[in-house]
């Protein structure tokens, strides 16, 4: 009979916080796409790329990727057709933590609370989003051998 040993690491929640940021930018419709007649649907996804901790602050870097479906009308034809446009907005935000989390394991969940894409004119859109960041810090207690 063989005895197998494993290390079990125990982590405890040290601090968590919630912060909301607003992202706002204008984008031009590429020349290869038709003019915007009517925006049908917009959707987006936010992800964090990195979380760096410096004492009681977490520097969160990430990006918001968005897409929209609109009815486009080209100048050379009377026909309207659906067109998809995508883009992304990068962000870097410093979030205050509730304690000194230097050396701890920190993760950050991000979610979109609101996404609004409006046509400024037929060749330009305005993208506004409210993003919620939830950095969570875990401290390493010990390793058990079983």
Predicted regions and their residues:
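Conserved small/polar residues in nucleotide/adenosyl-binding loops
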Residues: 139-146
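Beta-strand elements of well-folded, non-transmembrane domains
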Residues: 5-7, 15-19, 25-33, 42-57, ...
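Solvent-exposed beta-strand/loop surfaces of large extracellular or lumenal domains
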Residues: 81-110
């Amino acid at each position: 009979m063989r005895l197998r040993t494993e290390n079990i690491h125990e982590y405890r929640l040290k601090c968590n916080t919630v912060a909301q940021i607003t992202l706002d930018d204008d984008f031009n419709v590429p020349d290869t796409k038709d003019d915007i007649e009517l925006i049908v649907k917009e959707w987006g996804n936010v992800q964090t790329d990195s979380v760096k901790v410096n004492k009681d602050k977490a520097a969160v870097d990430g990006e918001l990727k968005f897409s929209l479906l609109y009815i486009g009308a080209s100048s050379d034809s009377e026909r309207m057709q659906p067109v998809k446009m995508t883009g992304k907005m990068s962000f870097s935000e410093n979030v205050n933590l509730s304690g000194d989390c230097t050396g701890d394991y920190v993760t950050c969940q991000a979610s979109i609370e609101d996404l609004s894409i409006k046509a400024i004119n037929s060749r330009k859109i305005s993208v506004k989003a409210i993003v919620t960041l939830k950095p969570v810090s875990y401290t390493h207690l010990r390793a058990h051998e079983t």
